[in-house]
Swiss-Prot record:
Residues 94-105 have a biased composition (Basic and acidic residues). NCBIfam families: PRK01777.1. This is Protein RnfH. Belongs to the UPF0125 (RnfH) family. Gene3D superfamilies: RnfH-like. It comes from Cupriavidus pinatubonensis (strain JMP 134 / LMG 1197). It comes from the Bacteria. InterPro entries: Mopterin_synth/thiamin_S_b, RnfH, RnfH_sf.
Length: 111
């Protein structure tokens, strides 16, 4: 197998407490799904279910059948643990309760 038939990629999965990142070579024409299996991430992070988790390349959502290219970073995305709107409301409320000028800027009649 010639070196020209290989592409260098990395697979990344972030847990709240650690990050899996592996850089390796795969055959040209390898899909994202095959790259994930080849990386061994499922042995290190058994909670990964490729059939339900979203995947992407450098922050752009892709389908598992997308073919990887040299230099791609395949990312496996976890489900959100908190509603982003609710989390933002809590942060704003906490800032407002602190009594700082920053916390008052969005209130009517605020500074």
């Amino acid at each position: 197998m010639a070196q020209a038939d290989m592409v260098r990629i990395s697979v990344c999965y972030a847990r709240p407490d650690s990050v899996f990142l592996k850089e390796f070579d795969v055959l040209q024409g390898t899909t994202i799904a095959a790259a994930i299996v080849s990386s061994g991430v499922q042995q290190v992070c058994p909670e990964i279910d490729p059939s339900t988790m979203r995947v992407g390349i450098y922050g752009k959502l892709k389908t598992p059948d997308t073919v990887v290219r040299t230099g791609d970073r395949v990312e496996i995305y976890r489900a959100l643990t908190a509603d982003p709107k609710l989390a933002r409301r809590r942060r704003v409320q906490k800032t407002r309760e602190s009594g700082t000028r920053e916390g008052q800027k969005w209130l009517r009649g605020g500074a």
